[in-house]
Structures are given as C-alpha cells and as structure tokens.
Amino acid sequence: MEKSKKDGHQAVLNEGEENELEVFGYHTQNLRRALCLVTAILTLGAVQLMFYWRPEWWVWTSCIPCPLQEADTILLRTTDEFRRYMRKKVFCLHLSTLKFPISKNPEEPLVADHHSVINQAVMKPELKLRCIQVQKIRYVWDFLKKRFQKVGLLEDSNSCFDIHHTFGLGLTNEEQEVRRLVCGPNSIEVEIQPIWKLLVKQVLNPFYVFQAFTLTLWLSQGYIEYSVAIIILTVISIVLSVYDLRQQSVKLHKLVEEHNKVQVTITVRDKGLQELESRLLVPGDILILPGKISLPCDAILIDGSCVVNEGMLTGESIPVTKTPLPQTENTMPWKSHSLEDYRKHVLFCGTEVIQVKPSAQGLVRAVVLQTGYNTAKGDLVRSILYPRPLNFKLYNDAFKFMVFLACVGVVGFFYALGVYMYHEVPPRETATMALILLSATVPPVLPAALTIGNVYAQKRLKKEKIFCISPQRINMCGQINLVCFDKTGTLTEDGLDLWGTVPTAGNCFQAVHSFASGEAVPWGPLCAAMTSCHSLILLDGTIQGDPLDLKMFEGTGWNMEDSQVASCKFGMADSSTVIKPGPKASQSPVDSITILRQFPFSSGLQRMSVIAQLAGDLHLHVYMKGAPEMVARFCRSETVPKNFSQELRNYTVQGFRVIALAHKTLKMERLSDMDHLAREKVESELAFLGLLIMENRLKKETRPVLKELSEARIRTVMVTGDNLQTAITVAKNSEMIPVGSQVVIVEANEPGDLVPASVTWQLVGTQEPGSGKKDTYIDIGNSSVPAGKGYHFAMSGKSYQVLFHHFYSMLPQILVNGTIFARMSPGQKSSLVEEFQKLNYYVGMCGDGANDCGALKMAHAGISLSEQEASVASPFTSKTANIECVPHLIREGRAALVSSFGVFKYLTMYGIIQFIGTSLLYWQLQLFGNYQYLLQDVAITLMVSLTMSINHAYPKLAPYRPAGQLLSPQLLLSVFMNSCFTCIVQVCTFLTVKQQPWYCEVYKYSECFLVNQSNLSANVSLDRNWTGNATLVPASVLSFEGTTLWPIVTFNCISAAFIFSKGKPFRKPIYANYLFSLLLASAAGLTIFILFCDFQDLYRKMEFIPTPTSWRVSILIAAFVQFCVAFFVEDAVLQNRELWLFIKKEFGFYSKSQYRILQRKLAEDSTWPPVNRTDYAVNGKNGFYVNRAYESPEEVPKGKLKLEEQASEQHFWTRL
C-alpha cells in the first residue's frame, strides 16, 4: 500500500468525506485488451459478463499499473466495508478550443484566483487538463498535490477578504469561458434512462442470468408449463421494476429540470450587468438578486440581505434570513471565520428567495460558490441516484445461503454425472440430467418471493399514511431496538403558547406578567425586544416566520409593515421592517420601531440579535434573544440577577420553553458604519432584560406510544435542540424516563490553558415542594445511584462534542444509558446516530425534518413527519404528524422480516425436498414427470411464495425482536432437521416400495388397470427388463418409485409451507391469511384426491402407476407422521424462546453486540455510574483519546472512527 502511494499509483479522493474513494492508476495495453475480447468471444460472452459484474477484473486483465499522472484508466474503490469498485476513463479538456488566445507561460496564472486548482491542473504548453467524472462530479489532476481535485466550486481556503475583493467586481469574459470549459455547465441533469437500457441492467442481474440458464435447460427437456409460468412471473417482475425506475427517473428529471433554465443577471468585470441562462454560471460570478427567484446555484451573500425558504433542503418551511459575509482583513478561511454558522451567509441551490433587502449600496449581490452537482441540491439528488448500500446482515446471510445451496447443487451435479456415466448413458444426456439436478436446489421463484413480502408491507404502510421510497429497508425496521426522537414538533406540539414574562429591574426578577389575563405586555425594554427581535417577514400582507417568533410578536399586540424608505436620523434610505403599536397593544410613548439590521438565529449560536431604532430616538438599539444560558454570557454581570440559574430551573423543570432577552444602546455617527459592524462587537456588554416563558405541550399520542415501545423493550432517546432541563422534564412527563429512575447530568468542559478536559457527573434529584408539584435539583450529597434504581445520562451538545474529542473511549459507556441529548446541532444528531450504530444498535430516527435530515438519512430507518421535498432523503415519510407511525413501522418491519425468513426457509426446503426425491430417482435413471413437477411448482410452491407474506402484522409489539440472522442456530437447525426428516421418509418409502410383493421396475400401463389392485401381485406377471414400445410412457418417468415419492414430496412441501408460516407474536395467526389457508387446504385436498382416485386418464396424464389402497394409506400415514414430528420439533423446540434462553445461559452463550457486552461489563462495576465527581483527562489538553477527524458540530465525519482500537489501553482517570 505504502509503495503504491510513493510511486504515485494510488491516491485518495474526497479524503475524510463520506464519499471517500481510493483511486488507482492503470494504462491500457492493446495486446491484453485483444486477448480479453477473444476470450469473451470464445466463451460466448460469459467472460464479458463477468467483467460487467466485476469491473476491476477487466482493469486487472487488460491494463497494467502505472502512476496516476500517466494513467488512461482509473480504478476506484470505496473505503467503506463494502469495498465496491468502479472503472473510469481519463479524458482531456483542451483550452486551445477557446476562441481567445491563452498564455502558455507556466508562470502566468490562468485565472485570477490564486487558490484555484485550475492554475495547478493546466499542462503547459499543451494547454490541456486531465479529468475524470465520478458520480456526476468532475475532478482534474492537480500536478502540484499529485491527486485529483474537485472542480465546480470556490476553494475553501479563500478568506472573507478574497471573496469580497477577488470576486467582488465579477469575472472577466475570458475567465468565465475558461471556468465554463473546466467546471462544466451549471445544471443538475438527471437523464431519463431509455427503457432498453433499464431492461438490459435488470436482465444482466446475476440471478436472472442463472434463471435464464435454468429455464433454457428445462425448456430443452420439454418442461414447458412451469418454465412459461416462471418466465411470465419474471417478465412481470422485470417490467414492474423497469416501470418504477423509469417513473422515479422521470419524476427526478422534472424536479430538477426547471432549475436549469433560470434567467439570471450577473456582473461582468469592466462591462457591467449582463443577463444569461443559469446553466452558464461559473464559480466566482457575481449574481444579482432582484427579488423572488429560485436559486440555480450555491452562492455567498456579500451585499444586502434576503429571506429564503429552505424547505426543499431542510424540510423546514419557516423563512430563513441570510446576511452578508463580513468584510474582514484577516486571511482566515471564510468558513472558519464564521465557525459552524457559515450557512447564514450561503444561499443554497433550489431554495426560494422570497424577499430581498438591499444594503446602502443598492443591490443584493452574491458570489457563486458551487455549481451543478456540487451544490446542496446536487448533493441531495446524488444521494438519491447513488444511495448508500444497506449493510443488513439478512442480505449478506441470504447470499451465503444461496452459495451453500449452489454447493449442494454442485454435489448433486457430480453425483448425477457418476450415476449416468456408470450406466453408460450418452454424454449429452448425462450432462443435461446433471445440470437439471444442479439447478434444482436454487428455486427460480426466490427473488420474486422475497420482494413480494416487501410489496405487501409497503401497501399496508400506505394505508397507515406511511410512505416508503426504499422498500428494502422495511425488513430492517423489524430489527430496530433503539429510536431517537426529536422533541419539538415530534414529541411535543408544534405551536407554543405564551405563558408569561419575567422582567428584571435593578438586578432582580420582578413579578410575572401572565398572558392568561389576555392583556398585552406592558411597554418597556422587554416589550421593545419582543416586538423587534425576531426574523418575521411580511409577505403578501401576511406575517410569516418561526412559530416561536410569531407567538412572541402576537403577545405584544403590535403590527408589522414594510417600509421601502425608512427615515431615520441618519437620513439614508434603506429597506427595513417597521413595527407599530396595534389596537390591542399597551400604551406606548413610541410610535414605531424600525428594524435596520438582523443577525439571524442559528442552532449553533443559539441566539439572534437585531439593530433597531425607536421613532424619535437619536440612538440605535441592539436587542438579543436566545437560550438563557447563552444570552447571559453576553450580558454585563451586574445586570444578570443573582438567582438567574435558580429562576431558570424553576421554569425549565416544569417543561416550559424559556427564552431570555437582552438590550444595549448603540452609539454611531453614520448609518453606513452599521453594515460593517462585526457581530461580536454588536453582541457584547448587553443588559439582561428578563425571561419569556412559553408552554410546549406533549402531543396526546406521545405517552402511549413511548409506553408501548418501552414494553416492547425498545430503547427511546430524545435528541433535541432545546434546553437540557426542559428536555429532562419532557422526558419524565412523557415517561421516557420511567418513574423512580435517576438522571445523571454529564457536563464536559474543553481543556483550558492549565486545566485538562474534564467531565462532571451530577445526580438530579426530585423533591416535593410545599406547592405540591415536583421540583428537580442537583443532589450533591449522594456519591452513587441508589441500588436497584435505573439511571439515565443526560447531556448537552457541547458536552457531547467534548466527550467526542477528548473522552471518546468513554463515550460508548455513556451512550449505553444515554437518554437525553439537548442543544444538539444537526451535525451532532447525525454523529450520535452513527455512534449508536457502532454499538450494534439498529437505530430508528423520527423527526419533523427541520434539522434532522442528516440523522434521518444516517439511521437504519429514518421516519420524517415532514411532507417537504427534503423527506426524499428519508426512507419513510408519515403524513400523520405524530409518533404513532413508529410502532406501526416496527410492527410491519417485524412481520415483513418474519415473512422473508419463512419464505426463504420454505423455498430452501422446497429445493432440498425436490433435490432428495430427484436424486433417489436418478439412482435408477428415472425422473418425475412434467405434470408432477408442474403441480408441485406452480399450484403449490409458486402460489405459496406469493401468498405466504400476505399475513398482517400482529397488533401488539412483542418484548423481543424476531431473529435477524439467516445463519442463526435455530434457522440452520430448522433447515437441517426438516431436511433429515424428509430424507428419512423419502429414503424409507423408496426402499420399502421395492420390497412389496407387487413391485416390478416397469409396467405396461394398460395392464395395470386391467387387474384387481388388491390382488395385483398374483395377477400381474411381467418381465422386469421389459422396456415397452413407442406408445407407452417413457421408462425414465413411469415407475412405482416415482408414484410413491411424488405424494411424499408434495405433502412435504405443503407441510413446510404450514410449519414455516409463523404467526404470533409477530404476525397474525395463519388462519387470518385466508388466501394462504385456502390454498394449503386445496393443495392438500388435491394431493389426497390424486393419491386415492383411480381415474385412468388422470393417472396417464400424471404418469403414475396405480398401487394397492393399503400402500396409498401407508404413504399418507408416513407423510402425516413426518408432518407431526417436524411441527413438534419446529414449534416446541426450535421456536421455543424459553428453551433457547435456558440453553444459552447454561452454556454461557451471550450476545456479541457491543452494547450488550458493555451492559454486562457495567452491571458488574460497582463504581458505575460515577456521581457527583469530576474526572480529568490525564494527558493534558488532548485528553486520553483525540479523534482528529472531528472538525465541527456541523461536519462530523461518517464511518471513520474505530471504537475498539484504543478503548482498553487508554482508560485512565483522575478524580477530584
């Protein structure tokens, strides 16, 4: 590996990102390529088909390794556990095709931006660039860094100064043309794939290829009816798949196409404004925002402000205010300057600009940041086009099981070869019969049968108003054992109700103003803050914005209006929002308040602020609102009441949503200076005004659903952006934290100059004050959780980040009992879900889609309660806006999983049953007849496979999950035991029939019916070596062995279908599946009828020989005994949960899931959980474990962390 990197053969693409790839350079050799083509022709395309399935084989055989710089073929490999390969051709872009001269001087940059990779990728004097296109993204070879670099975006290394001054005046026409050629068009084009191409992709699926081989073989042997039935079913399946793919392609194409043809206005350097089609935009262009527009690219706002609807990307329909990137002189990268809050300056592609507010310069301008598939919308579309593969053990086990069945078939193949060669049968017939036995073990109906269960489950979910865009995830829902819930809008109501305000005066809280009286807030600084500190906008005469802001504003009784020319003392025009008292407002000495500038709220900063002017006032005023703990940090300490923490806790423990407000006077000489003020300067030295108290009620469905999940032993976790105390109270009120359980708050702090990173454990106690309501406090006295009581960890996003950075080895131990995660940013939510997955939890995530898109996408089953377009990144969407959808989905997932296992076991047994019967007949060169196969394959197996999964989910969630592994001992024993039973019965009847006095090897058909069956042995005297003539049934089919084995095999198939159709506790009983029950009863009745009837035409058609009635009764008894034994073993032994738990306990078998191992370990640790103490990281500032890949709460790496490597050897603590 290291050698490959040193010689330039290997590099990494998108290093540290979710879509990280390893790239290898190869050079095509014509001789090797010619040999591959000749081999493909000689093998009739078989080798070419293998190359299609495994592109790396084609590269390894037709190319030789070489440095990437010289390669014409690139082999890419994902760095995840799947290690998938892709092959890409290197192509060149020639700048000489441009219509203006290009300098060939290596010292002269091609574009003005000295950070641009374009300057480092151009080969001079050839004037060409080497490129590859991977999943819609173009990469160019960087000769300086010796790796492929992404184009179509501005480099992150640009500073705020670079953005404003390098690109502030626009690009020249020449630079636009260069960037246009290199970066490609600014369009997100989803090709509507031709039907023939979709068909080819479906048909070339490995299983369909094997199926085609099998059906060709069967058709060549005259087995037409069943082959035609399978062909029809396969064609229907392929057509439906192609239709679905085509519809999705058309829908996605229509969704993105309209954004490719937007007319926009840009600024061209030295030429002024110019109109052009949006597909011609390039990174660095200056985009003019005239008003309402659908953004065709990602852009950084540099002048003015605007309000956008980001619902398409975030699922949040609340308008978001964007502010310009500050003009600073430092060289810090612009994203680092704005920390995780850089998104407040970025306008994302696909979002709608609904209002613009020009600055003093008169225009709202933005620099194009990313184009095409590099944009936020492009990334969303790519996530749909190239979804992350499912790492579900069921599918891996299914593949292994198929390989095992194929191996059994190979054994049968050589067995058939040996038998037929021993009897000197012609080679062609020998090969054909051997191939027939090979194909018998893998049922061709298997893929359709496994798919049909998900189709039924999908339809049942649709009736519950749960929509699914990823049906293969339904089975995964059956394994969910942990569900993360957002709080606001998910567990609690969307809307907030005003409860009251708690103003301050003279460093003390004053009397509460209650909104229950119906009176508006009395005039004062607190009222002024409530009227102005919000992100509300007036759109078409309607006030729109965040529900919290709306409720707060309604409580003041003031009205809003837009003023395009707002007068102020500075005498400058500006587009501003003006607030005036309404008829319900308290009496005020102020006629109006003008909002001049806004610093928007973000989940990372947990605050917002505005600069406003009161009518008649000579000064400007700053108002701030946000999380109380955050706002208090920016206030002068003498203005914050001494009992601030206690007062805040009094309300948060009751489940109230608490917002703090603050204010200061801003002295300025010129209004133009306001636009250049840094947020840090504005938000400092404020005076604390008071608290706004709002109620956030639980939804009525929350408590019953959480109780149902708890009884089913499914862990529930709250992941919210709200206050920690509020989250704890909601968790207790909803009984997410059961009555009697203890809560331990985990508070972690970053390392200081002399103090290492630390983590403090505080036990939250509960007491009953005199008022009768429960209060929550920090219990300092206790040093451990009381024995016998459960405990739950609660922490904030800040603490989670510190733990992730400095105490990563301890994080899994906390997560095993972590229940409340508050003040979590979107990136932290995604990271938390991933960390739970590393502990082998199957994680469900339920949220309203606002800040949960990443977590919904990361979870095994993301359930969005939002109907916005962003939910396309979530596998499931519920139109019912409460969490009742979660148990519905889990129930259907469990039922679908059990159905899949049942169908898989049945079809496996069906293959083995037929394999054993056919092998026995092969011993004497015989075979079942076509109609015998047809009845088993079509009337029984095919219909069973299509109806077994119709069974509905059981209405109550069981307190345990269904088996999730096909290779589990129970399932393997089930298949093995049933195989043994059917083998014993078939072999015994096969040998016993030979011992009957009336037995002979071959009979003349008509004579069998002329004799008295009860006296058959006395009346029939035929030569055992008689071979019949052309008018008789072929000797290879007509035999007593075949006539005996066929009903045994058929009854075995019916028995297996009944035994494996498991009902309670995950599905309704078998009799509730009316169609399936009727089918089994009909199949059993038909088989008995054929067994005992004496219709000559029927026997001739079925190719049977009549046998004595006593023998037929013996066959029925043998089949019934086999059914009883198999049913008893399956139901009383293999499916006996208590018995298996006892066996596991006696033999010391325990779950190998990481969370189970940790639970057992912690249960034996008397010092866990630590309470009322502080632990420090021993090796100073970096703690005992540092994850270097973790950069920020918004950019948490995916799948790059390894839990086991350092967890054991670096677990050192010091205690305070």
Curated annotation (Swiss-Prot):
EC class: translocase
S-S bridge residues: none
InterPro entries xrefs: ATPase_P-typ_cation-transptr_N, ATPase_P-typ_cyto_dom_N, ATPase_P-typ_P_site, ATPase_P-typ_TM_dom_sf, ATPase_P-typ_transduc_dom_A_sf, HAD-like_sf, HAD_sf, P-type_TPase_V
Pfam name, any one: P5-ATPase
Tissue: Specifically expressed in brain and stomach.
Residues bearing attached sugar chains per UniProt: 650, 817
GO CC term, one of those recorded: membrane
Active site: 486 (4-aspartylphosphate intermediate)
Transmembrane segments: 33-53, 198-218, 222-242, 401-421, 433-453, 896-916, 933-950, 971-991, 1040-1060, 1075-1095, 1113-1133
Locations listed in the record: Membrane
Binding site for Mg(2+): 848, 852
Entry membrane topology: Multi-pass membrane protein
Gene Ontology molecular function terms on file: ATP binding; ATP hydrolysis activity; ATPase-coupled monoatomic cation transmembrane transporter activity; metal ion binding; P-type ion transporter activity
Keywords, sorted A to Z: ATP-binding, Glycoprotein, Magnesium, Membrane, Metal-binding, Nucleotide-binding, Translocase, Transmembrane, Transmembrane helix
Protein EC: 7.2.2.-
The reaction(s) this protein catalyses: ATP + H2O = ADP + phosphate + H(+)
Domain of life: Eukaryota
Family: Belongs to the cation transport ATPase (P-type) (TC 3.A.3) family. Type V subfamily.
Entry protein name: Probable cation-transporting ATPase 13A5
Lineage: Eukaryota, Metazoa, Chordata, Craniata, Vertebrata
